[in-house]
Amino acid sequence: MSINKTLKIATRQSPLALWQANYVKNRLQQRYSHLSVELVPIITKGDVILDTPLAKIGGKGLFVKELENALLNGEADIAVHSMKDVPMQFPKGLELSVICPREDPRDAFVSNKYRTLDELPQGAIVGTSSLRRQCQLKNWRADLDIRSLRGNVGTRLNKLDQGDYDAIILASAGLIRLGLTERIRSFIEIDTILPACGQGAVGIECRVDDRDVQSLLMPLADQTTTYCVLAERAMNFHLQGGCQVPIGAYAILENNQLYLRGLVGDVHGSQILSAEGQFELSLDFESSQSAVQKAEELGVSIAEQLLQQGADKILQAVYQS
């Protein structure tokens, strides 16, 4: 792109979304000192409708549609998203260009009364609107009273502080990025609650034909995070899942081995299906395209294991409810 042109970043207006957009802006300007970068804050449907669970109004895709429209009509050059909010498919003409380094992928236990999930008394009120968290919490502790909790991070913390809940569950990455680490009473380990696909990662979407912008973005990509998140998303896509379904996935890349664990649960926690596997990624010898293909094949493989266990029946029941 022309050095005189301003790069415009579409972003939601929540504090966390603005942090992510500014993170991308700062990284770009550190690398390209003469590049002018401007934020284009946009209110999305998901930010406006706060009194209804996301699963009832179309899932987390509601947080990205208006940003994608800004890309398509030329109001913005790129859009910055939390990867766990990004739908599996993109509108024609748009693509996921870059996935940035991942923050802590775990969920966080936040409470003014208790230090851990284990300390919660019988019948404790726990706030979350995530079906993924709900099914795993109910499977672990059927006695817990899980209640809906919508809004940005500050809104959710305020509801906790007002006494509406004994505890709430939030993504630790958001709290860390907003400088609210002190609100985390404990991190919930992966074995207790498996994260959402892409949780903790920031993605950048742009137009397919905008090669100049894509070349600017490439230095921001994190190879390890990319392979892990693409494996998680491939699993989700093969399950025909979305962002607001009781599906969890988490991949790690260590010593050229890509490990992926996946989970599907019924919303009441009465049935949890899980599967895991690994593929070798010889990063020193394989092209990035070949590694991406292998990562996605691993995701499909884990999805197939879950489908063989009956995941499709569980998800069908969720969609019909």
Curated annotation (Swiss-Prot):
Q: Which cofactor does it need?
A: dipyrromethane
Any one Gene Ontology cellular component term annotated for this protein: cytoplasm
EC number(s)? 2.5.1.61
Q: Could you tell me which pathway this protein works in?
A: Porphyrin-containing compound metabolism; protoporphyrin-IX biosynthesis; coproporphyrinogen-III from 5-aminolevulinate: step 2/4
Question: What does the entry comment about cofactor binding?
Answer: Binds 1 dipyrromethane group covalently.
Which Gene Ontology terms cover its molecular function? hydroxymethylbilane synthase activity
The record's Gene3D superfamilies line, in alphabetical order, gives: Periplasmic binding protein-like II, Porphobilinogen deaminase, C-terminal domain
Superkingdom: Bacteria
Q: What class of enzyme is it?
A: transferase
| InterPro entries reported for this sequence | HemC, Porphobilin_deaminase_cofac_BS, Porphobilin_deaminase_N, Porphobilinogen_deaminase_C, Porphobilinogen_deaminase_C_sf
The alphabetical list of record keywords is: Porphyrin biosynthesis, Transferase
Which Gene Ontology BP annotations are present?
protoporphyrinogen IX biosynthetic process
- S-(dipyrrolylmethanemethyl)cysteine, modified sites: C243
Pfam families from the UniProt entry: Porphobil_deam, Porphobil_deamC
Q: Which reaction does it catalyse?
A: 4 porphobilinogen + H2O = hydroxymethylbilane + 4 NH4(+)
Coiled-coil regions listed:
none
Q: What family does the entry list?
A: Belongs to the HMBS family.
Concerning NCBIfam families, the annotation shows: hemC
Record note on quaternary structure: Monomer.
Beyond the main fields, what else does the record say? The porphobilinogen subunits are added to the dipyrromethane group.
| HAMAP family referenced in this protein's UniProt entry, alphabetically | Porphobil_deam
Q: What does this protein do?
A: Tetrapolymerization of the monopyrrole PBG into the hydroxymethylbilane pre-uroporphyrinogen in several discrete steps.
Name used for this protein in its record:
Porphobilinogen deaminase
